[in-house]
């Protein structure tokens, strides 16, 4: 997997974190450096750790699905992408009610925004991709996108539209990466 694909994957995965960060930034009237750091650090850390967990799990079963690994990666990426696209059209309010940069809420948001990365880690194992570079890129991109999302959300009147558009774009990118994987395996 080349660097541009890894970067696109990282950007797509960071869209959930970005969308939540925009909403959190909109909700937090006083956005301090400490709050920015806490949310950005945790989102980046969880986004980096979840693919490792998925990759390690995937390595255990990769020999059983080797002939179909590209299909597994395609299905997982498309499933994640489709869910992100579906969620981008969700009209229910997802703005946190309490400080999202503290305590259990911070951990739960970090987990929720990084679950897609778990499945991506499994896909990377199926494709026999080294995990080191993707993990670093995914973590750094998530950290930066969270930081930017917090700042944007804090300066906007309505965070919902930008956050949902980011989630829609992220879902589309994941689906395109899935199609690219099939193309690389000469499926079409």
From Swiss-Prot:
Pfam families: Mntp (PF02659). InterPro entries: Mntp/YtaF, Put_MntP. It is found in: Cell inner membrane. GO terms for cellular component: plasma membrane. Its main location: membrane. It comes from the Bacteria. One of its GO terms (molecular function) is manganese ion transmembrane transporter activity. The chain crosses the membrane at residues 6-26, 36-56, 60-80, 106-126, 131-151, 168-188. Keywords: Cell inner membrane, Cell membrane, Ion transport, Manganese, Membrane, Transmembrane, Transmembrane helix, Transport. Probably functions as a manganese efflux pump. Belongs to the MntP (TC 9.B.29) family. This is Putative manganese efflux pump MntP. It comes from Desulforapulum autotrophicum (strain ATCC 43914 / DSM 3382 / VKM B-1955 / HRM2).
């Amino acid at each position: 997997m080349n660097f541009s694909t890894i970067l696109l994957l990282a950007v797509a995965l960071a869209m959930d974190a970005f969308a939540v960060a925009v909403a959190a930034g909109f909700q937090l009237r006083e956005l301090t450096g400490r709050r920015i750091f806490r949310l950005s650090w945790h989102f980046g850390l969880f986004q980096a750790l979840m693919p490792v967990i998925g990759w390690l799990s995937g390595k255990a079963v990769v020999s059983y699905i080797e002939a179909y690994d590209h299909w597994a990666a395609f299905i997982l990426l498309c499933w994640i992408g489709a869910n992100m696209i579906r969620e981008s059209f969700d009209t229910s309010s997802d703005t946190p009610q309490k400080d999202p940069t503290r305590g259990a809420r911070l951990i739960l948001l970090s987990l929720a925004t990084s679950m897609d990365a778990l499945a991506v880690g499994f896909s990377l194992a199926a494709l026999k991709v080294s995990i080191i570079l993707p993990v670093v890129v995914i973590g750094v991109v998530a950290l930066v996108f969270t930081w930017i999302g917090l700042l944007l959300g804090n300066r906007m009147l309505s965070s919902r539209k930008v956050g949902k558009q980011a989630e829609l774009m992220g879902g589309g990118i994941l689906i395109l990466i899935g199609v690219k994987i099939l193309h690389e395996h000469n499926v079409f």
